[in-house]
């Protein structure tokens, strides 16, 4: 892995979820700067608006809850904002300004629906933890999700396999971004819930031919 990226090279951490869902969707949003909203994205944004309150923190049952925490990893080349970071008193933790003792951090990601079948949520949460680890020089073994639809909290172990996967995806994202390349993908059922279906036009992708082949056909037909 590239040892370190510059500030100008950092990609949005939120793009990891788009990339896992569909590489083409990610490229349309982050390379071509396309964006469309559907019911799912609007509901998700409303939930995050309730969570996001910059620089706000509270203490309950000995746990310090910080909201909208900016994070970055120059090793992964990612930056973003954690919905919530919980700091629990620990002898092996970090010191916080204005607080006595040391605390262990853990990211908590708020989600609109229920647990997904793919690994996109896990990748995003793990990336947040990796950013915090790099910034605070501490190991973070677990993170958590709170699923709004089912009012349920789920803890996630941040395994070596998951950490390696985040690194691989980050590298692939940077490779596409540096080339300015929007990949083609096979249409699937997931396309129906994609906020960019009208921009992507997945049903037409199989009909698209490379420009070089089109020119060659015109020469042969002429």
Report each predicted region and the residues it spans.
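Glycine-rich, flexible loop/turn motifs
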Residues: 6-7, 15, 152, 181, ...
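Short, intrinsically disordered, charge-biased short linear motifs at domain edges
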Residues: 6-9, 172-188
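Metal-dependent nuclease catalytic cores that hydrolyze phosphodiester bonds in DNA/RNA
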Residues: 1-107, 207, 217-222
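Cysteine-cluster motifs in flexible loop/terminal segments that predominantly coordinate metals
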Residues: 22, 181-222
């Amino acid at each position: 892995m590239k040892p370190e990226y510059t500030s100008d090279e950092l990609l949005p951490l939120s793009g990891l979820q788009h990339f896992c869902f569909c590489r083409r969707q990610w490229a349309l949003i982050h390379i071509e700067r396309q964006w469309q909203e559907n019911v799912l994205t609007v509901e998700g944004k409303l939930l995050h608006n309730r969570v996001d309150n910059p620089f706000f923190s509270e203490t309950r049952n000995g746990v310090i809850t910080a909201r909208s925490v900016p994070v970055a990893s120059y090793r992964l080349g990612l930056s973003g904002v954690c919905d919530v970071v919980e700091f629990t008193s620990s002898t092996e933790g970090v010191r916080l300004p204005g607080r006595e003792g040391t605390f262990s951090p853990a990211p908590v990601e708020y989600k609109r629906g229920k647990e997904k079948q793919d690994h996109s949520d896990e990748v995003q949460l793990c990336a947040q933890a990796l950013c915090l680890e790099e910034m605070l020089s501490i190991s973070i073994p677990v993170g958590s999700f709170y699923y709004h639809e089912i009012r349920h909290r789920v803890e996630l172990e941040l395994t070596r396999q998951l950490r390696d996967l985040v690194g691989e995806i980050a590298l692939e994202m940077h490779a596409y971004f540096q080339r300015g390349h929007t990949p083609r993908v096979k249409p699937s059922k997931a396309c129906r819930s994609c906020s960019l279906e009208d921009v992507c036009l997945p049903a037409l992708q199989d009909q698209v031919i490379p420009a070089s082949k089109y020119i060659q056909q015109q020469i042969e037909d002429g």
